[in-house]
Each structure stands twice: as structure tokens, then as C-alpha cells.
């Protein structure tokens, strides 16, 4: 399973204002095997072009929730015109999209009745996509424990800002370290994404710090196999 981070930023990154800024991050979005898109946010068409992806290759679109940085109707229409289909999910649902089995779990976010995290399997590898959201919910933890997850991607919006009000719907770095400690034996590899512009250091500093805790820090355009 190949994954490409089309965006790794939180909602406070705006292309018009910050696009030329060093370390610019688009709104968070992930592409699996160049065909399964998680979160059709406003920056996705630009990211697909910049990172050399075939827009006609995107076949499946799924969405964690409808906040503006994760869902954009124009992006969905843009990809539908190129052959993609949008598949809505509610928590507790499992759907088969081609070779992928996609299960949705309620997430701890401000729109929790609609906001979900995903576990995606291609029959060989298992990916947990856990943003947006704070502490993981019971059902998704049990699903992670049932069968080894090859890669877990966690929300790290709030940085090191201990006591930040966002921790009731987003993780800070202390929280992701604690989650990893509790699920270490169930997950082979850990990454963080969804970094807020105003709450994080430069990427290189963050990556060095989090490597000490066994985390990789995603950045726009980063591509890896799991």
C-alpha cells in the first residue's frame, strides 16, 4: 500500500496567505495507491498537480467530516468529472471499495456524531487514519487491538501547547506519545499529521523531536510504502 500526503496542515493554513511561506502545509489529505482519496479538501487539486498525480486515477473519495479544510464541494465535483465516486460514511459502517475494505469509527471531534476515523485494509496491509480527533474512542481502540495495524497516522494539531483548549477535539504532542505507549504492541509504525501553523515549530525541529518518541512527521508530498 502506497500512501501520499497531499496535505499535512490544520485549518489555519491558507494558500492565499501562506502558500509562499517556508514549510507551508496544505489542509490535510491522504492519497492511497494514487486511487483512494481521504478528505477532498480545497487544496487537493493543487496538490495532485504539484505532486504529479493523475487526477483521472482517483476512483474513490471518502471523508472524515465536513469541516471546510477536509471537505470542499468543488473538489468533489472536480474529481467526479474525472471519474471518481464519493462514498459517504457514518460510524460503524464498513464498505468494500475495489480491493479496499474501509471501516469507519466515531472520532472524538467537535462534530463527533458525523466525524469518523478509518481503518483501511487492502488484504495485506492495514492503515489507521486518525484525524481529526483527540483521545481515541473505545470502539476504534478495540479494532486496532483485534489485528495489527501497519501504520497509524494521528492528529497532532495542538503541538506542545499544554493546556490548549483544542485538546478536547485534537491531540497535542503529549497525547500522541501517550496513545503510542498504550498501543505500541498493536501498531508497527507511527506518524503524525494535521499540524496547526500557529502551534508548531519548523518541520525539521519537530521531526527531530518526535523521532525520539518513535514518530515520523508527515509533510506535503511525502510518499511511503507500508
Residue spans of the language-model regions?
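Cap/insert and terminal regions of metallo-dependent hydrolase folds
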Residues: 135-223
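Conserved beta-strand hairpin/beta-sheet module of binuclear metal-dependent hydrolase folds
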Residues: 1-50, 114-131, 151
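Catalytic core of the metallo-beta-lactamase
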Residues: 93-148
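Hydrophobic/aromatic beta-strand patches that form the interior of the parallel beta-sheet core
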Residues: 4, 60-62, 87, 103, ...
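Short acidic-hydrophobic surface loop/beta-edge motif
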Residues: 30-32, 92-99, 224-225
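Active-site metal-binding loops of divalent metal-dependent hydrolases
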Residues: 8-10, 35, 40-43, 66, ...
